[in-house]
Regions:
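N-terminal "arm"/small-domain region of PLP-dependent enzymes with the aminotransferase-like
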Residues: 1-70, 77-80, 84
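Conserved core of the PLP fold type I
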Residues: 55, 60-205
């Protein structure tokens, strides 16, 4: 069965990390993968994280598995953290939250929902975007468009280009936006720019 499957290309970011590990330069700094490493190249467990784990272990009363949406208390807490406790959307019951196995798991579930609910929708992804986004979302048959995002000259957001490109997004399309610390460029929208994008979404009907 497996012999009919094509070998996937190597991940370019993980390949860079392997090349960095093989580099003998004593002054090298590995900035390829989004994790903190100490001077010896180890990703340590911070003391605050260790204590939090111990506190959770001490409070745990069951190993029963969670419902499909995950931990209700966690979902409510993360929704309040993102939207604010006074959010009208929360008060009106317009927010749904689920736990997923990481960001890629969230995107895969989102892709399946989009394909089931709006199979003709185009998904707009930033240029650049994290390399796994397009194959991950495309694996369910979604179609893509790109919008300008990073401006190498200013090392910031090409907001004029972004707005021009998203001006072509149709009602029912889906725009993949990075909430903070855009992956991979790190450039973020200002609150004023977020407001412009939100107005465009409402006016044009994209999600």
């Amino acid at each position: 069965m497996f012999q009919v499957l094509d070998q996937l290309p190597a991940d370019p970011i993980l390949g860079l990390s392997a090349a960095c590990r093989a580099d003998t330069n004593p002054h090298k700094v590995d900035l390829t993968i989004g994790i903190y490493m100490d001077d010896s190249g180890v990703c340590p467990v911070f003391e605050a994280v260790r204590r939090a784990q111990q506190a959770l272990d001490a409070e745990e009363v069951t190993k029963a598995y969670l419902p499909p949406a995950g931990d209700d208390v966690f979902n409510r807490g993360i929704s309040e953290l993102v939207l604010g406790r006074g959010s009208a959307a929360l008060a009106d019951g317009r927010v749904s939250s689920i736990q997923t196995p990481g960001g890629c798991g969230a995107l895969r579930i989102g892709a399946e929902i989009i394909q089931a609910a709006a199979p003709g929708a185009r998904v707009w992804v930033s240029d650049p975007t994290w390399p796994v986004h397009i194959p991950l979302l495309g694996s369910v048959g979604l179609q893509f468009e790109s919008y300008r995002y990073y401006d190498p000259a200013s090392h910031g957001v090409d907001f004029e280009g972004m707005v021009a490109d998203l001006g072509r997004a149709a009602a029912g399309d889906v725009v993949l936006l990075h909430g903070c610390c855009h992956n991979p460029c790190g450039a973020d929208l200002s609150p004023e720019q977020w407001a412009v994008v939100a107005d465009m979404a409402e006016r044009q009907g994209f999600t």
